[in-house]
Amino acid sequence: MHIRICFLSALLPTVFLASGEEPSDSLVRELQEIVVTADQPATRLEGNVLVSTITGSNLQNLGTALDVLAQLPLMKVEDGAVSVAGKGIPDVYIDGRPMRDGDELRNLSSSDLKKVELLLAPGAMYGNTTEAVVRITTRKRFWKGFSFTNRAAAEKRRCWSASDMIDAGWRSGNLELFATGSVSRYDSRIKGTTVNRLEYDGEEAEIGSSQDNRAPSTVGVVKAGFNFSSGAHSAGAYYRYNPEHGDFCNEGSEWTGTTAPVRRRIDRDIRSRSHLAAVYYDGNLAGKCLLHFDGTFRRSSSTSATATTYAEEGYAEVSSVEKKNSSLYAGKLYASLPLFKGDFTTGIQDSYTHTRLDYRMLNQAVGEYIPSGLTETRQKSLAAFAQWNRTFHRFSLSAGLRYEYVDYAFDKDGRRDNDVSRRNHLLTPDISLGYSFCDDASVSISYKMSTEKPPYPQLTGSLNYVGIHEIEGGNPALRDGRMHNLQVFGMWRGFILQASFMRSIDTYAFVKELYPAPTLQLMMHPVNIDVSALNLFLVWSRPMGKWTPNFTVGVYRQWLEAGGGRHDRPIFSYYLDNVVALPFGMLLSVNAHGQTSGDMHTNRFGTTWFALDASISRSFFNESLDVKLSATDIFGTLNNDWTMDTYGVSMVKRQSYDRRGVTLTLTYRFRPRASRYKGEAASQSELDRL
């Protein structure tokens, strides 16, 4: 008999163990969480959902939710960021509510995970910009009273970084109170060179620069809230404050052609803060209909002061100041009920987003071609959606439809720009059909139409000074993209196949080209493009005793003509993840990966033949104390170089990232719990764009 587990993408606030007297029915409740079968696979395909069970596996003692996700099929975690192969960054839900920041995954213990589900064809309920969804279910805890967790980490790469987090909760009767506070000091160092070659005034020209970036920053988070439940109704709210201070420095040089390099230093001081408040309500009507409401408010502000100074005479200091303010109001209301022997969900969602950017160039000469300016964007969005799911015999069917109205307004120096402002009506359908041959063999096919909205920083009209001959900027004329995605997903025993073909219209990519100015200037900025792409991944994953391997091979191939050239070299990649249970309760993870050189949009990335990460962990004092030692890029073989060839400008960027290092993490828990705020972001996609 085997206890198997379903696992996939992202995770929730801290879930903690408790000491003290158990409720009399705790054993019954705990047994209800465990499924015991003779041949249940560790990872299985249910319709278009890949399910991984964590409870009872080697993965449950890895440390945090991030550690577990890094070992799951089609999942990758790098520097705390979760991604899905061929899909990019997923939306993560923990116990039905969305994750709002990466700290939730760091604070969630792997021993509190029950299962992880990966949706590669999410329906209309998740929004038309969502390509993948990770749903994490935690093990239920029934403890009352006080819970406490403290996690401290120290990391040494080229520089030292450290963080400390304290999480506390208290529950009595129907009321739960929780609070979290953390402070982190990050520091990194990136070295590299950038060389641009082009034809200018009928002659070959070269513009180059060297970089030695130091990026220390201090980040704080304070969060507090409550949950209250009574019978079939529950409600809650929380508030989060997030200040941040960064003091960046870049020392290097600039040159053109055969001239001697000019030494320069770029200093940038960034101060930002954000406030977020959220409320929710859940109601179960007549035992059949679930009613859910979420409301979200966010306000943030930041100030960035940049000064570029040159050691040689004849070059004046170039300084600028940028002030940015943004706000978001959003609401979401939906109801779920049984319909035609299936599950039906319908609802509405709205949001209002306002962003104001005031950019001031303080150098008069540079201001002739990089002017000061005030830009504002306002977006109103209203959506209605419906989703129906049903399983009959060996078939599973899911169909959905989403309508969205978007009113986007762009103002430049107090005047509305009608060429950029627009109103859109979007109708996006999705459908998925799956068939199960047996417990370990199934297949599904799905189609989804979705939209791709550029992040708000890419929609600004301001330009930024990068060097004597280089500029970077946004593009307020960027249009929302449309994406058609046809996908086949299959599983046979321990093998998983995921193949998708995407046709993207008006997605965006970066290009570099000549900028009209009195002197030679190059500008890098985003533009709309049309691209077709094929993703193909084959995974083998099957636990074998104390060893849990996961081997993935894949290929990405795109068809793109942009910037006066073709970008269609395929990228082949592999991932070999291993978890081994050692004696004395220790766990060892060893992960290797690599990829060939190839094109992704207008960028051609370099080859990494082999890179290795590893970690070892152990729990002490009845799992109250966890100790973990991890190492990244052990042999320093990661290749972060990339090139771009657009509009007659050939750019080669060689850079050495700060990835090689060692981290020690200590986690102490006293009566930890999994329960936290039960609501979800009313407009998570707008929060991500901000």
What are these regions (language model features)?
Residues 376-379, 422, 451-505, 522-534, ...:
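Outer-membrane beta-barrel signature, preferentially recognizing the C-terminal barrel domain
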Residues 137-152, 244, 249-253, 305-309, ...:
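Surface-exposed extracellular loop regions of Gram-negative outer-membrane beta-barrel proteins
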Residues 219-245, 267-413, 436, 440, ...:
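Face-selective signature of the C-terminal outer-membrane beta-barrel domain
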Residues 43, 66-98:
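Extracytoplasmic beta-strand/coil segments of soluble accessory domains associated
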Residues 328-332, 383, 473-475, 479, ...:
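Outer membrane beta-barrel strand-and-loop segments of large Gram-negative receptors
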Residues 33, 65-68, 102-103, 117-118, ...:
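N-terminal periplasmic accessory domains that precede
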Residues 71, 97-123:
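Short acidic/polar hinge/loop motifs at secondary-structure boundaries
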